[in-house]
């Protein structure tokens, strides 16, 4: 069996990346074509600069945060493993982890932001909560790029983006990945997030709070 590839080649450079948790016989890379598509789009459309305020959302193992670390991005995720992998991969590439601000799903990223990169999560409830909370951080000039693998992108993703953020423009599929550009529409009325869902456990005094992407 050939060893799994651990070096990602991107317009921003060459980066060593590994997944978490570590497995003796790892079968999967720490990035996918959707990560590569986002980084290619950034290289083509965004002029590098220290003043660009970047927010990365749902970065599985830190591929995006590592490649864009020179821009001091915020990395917003509900996964502790993602945070660990991001820190490990920053260190593995000689990058100070303090340069990337990790934000968990119960925290609100700082705004405003100029560039948002979103990897579509498996659970659309999480995406809905994130988009609603993201909206106040956007300006009319914010560039929002959304990506995922074609097989994991239901049509409801487009409907949700257009309802909560603005008009979408979909690029051609590339390496079985899809990229969506979103133009923020600040005139849209965005509802309050329905999360966390709260209910009282039958027969007890316990009030249960169920956050997006948490199952009970």
Label the model's feature ranges.
Residues 140-152:
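Conserved beta-strand signature within the Rossmann-like core of class I S-adenosyl-L-methionine
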